[in-house]
Amino acid sequence: MTTPAFPDLVPALAAALPELRGKLTANAPIADVTWFRVGGPAQVLFQPADEADLAYALAHLPAEIPVTVIGLGSNLIVRDGGVPGMVIRLGRGFTDIAVDGTTIVAGAGVPDVKVARAAADAGLAGLAFLRGIPGAIGGALRMNGGAYGGETKDALMSARAVDRAGRIHILSLDDMGFTYRHSAAPEDFIFTQATFRGTPGEVAEIQAEMERITSSREATQPIKSRTGGSTFKNPPGHKAWQLVDAAGCRGLVLGRAQVSEMHTNFLINLGCATAAEIEGLGEEVRRRVLETSGVTLEWEIKRIGLPA
């Protein structure tokens, strides 16, 4: 599918942001940074050099330009028409990890699994659950990411964020307002760093727990397919996959998108699906689940951009 290009904003932004150190790219393809491998371009992709560069950009970016943040692209559908405005992706300047006693400080661009490994290597228990989340720390902060009995709220001490005006904030655990797959932090906050606290433990036991999580994921989830991870949040008192299965949606196909046969809360790109097919399949699943069980499933996957 050919997506029309957006107007090129880079020359105007470069003029408005003369001290910018990060990279601006016009009409940047971003499908390949998502796990589904679908979607149109970012009107402008900005990869900030570090937190100060991000704050500078946001402080001087014209207010009428919308801002969207993406991480590793694991829990994300980019629609086929692309994403207008500025898409921010945190790269190398946000990938440091430091361990000090029982404390781990990690940039928002660090994959969750790397934090789990750093904790295990340091003999710190309580963060192994991050091994089961296929995303980055920024996403875990935004949605209280969790898996295998643990959630971000269980280990977080504090977080750093930059708001749309370029102001830097330090948020305590209470400030984050965590609930199931949700943070009450303002929507315009872009997380840049997290500080976690672990509990001293035995390295071998922690590593064994991580291996159990890895084995469980491989046995029960289609992790080798083009998928976005868990599609729907678990409604109170229910498991989303059970509701999807009971609605007869296991293996359901729309175009080149499919509900996984292995785990019904996963959607799969069979090879050359469009974002519209994947999202449309998810909506059909929601319709059937509502019809059969009376439960309205809420998307866990983030969907951004415009239809083609």
Curated annotation (Swiss-Prot):
Example GO biological process = cell wall organization
Q: Where is this region: Disordered?
A: 216-236
GO molecular-function terms, A-Z = FAD binding; UDP-N-acetylmuramate dehydrogenase activity
Residues of the active site: 181, 230 (proton donor), 300
A Pfam short name = MurB_C
Residue ranges annotated for the FAD-binding PCMH-type domain, each copy included: 37-201
| EC number(s) per entry | 1.3.1.98
Q: Which cofactor does it need?
A: FAD
Gene Ontology CC, one term: cytosol
Keywords, alphabetical: Cell cycle, Cell division, Cell shape, Cell wall biogenesis/degradation, Cytoplasm, FAD, Flavoprotein, NADP, Oxidoreductase, Peptidoglycan synthesis
Record protein name field: UDP-N-acetylenolpyruvoylglucosamine reductase
State the species of origin.
Answer: Azorhizobium caulinodans (strain ATCC 43989 / DSM 5975 / JCM 20966 / LMG 6465 / NBRC 14845 / NCIMB 13405 / ORS 571)
* Gene this chain is encoded by: murB
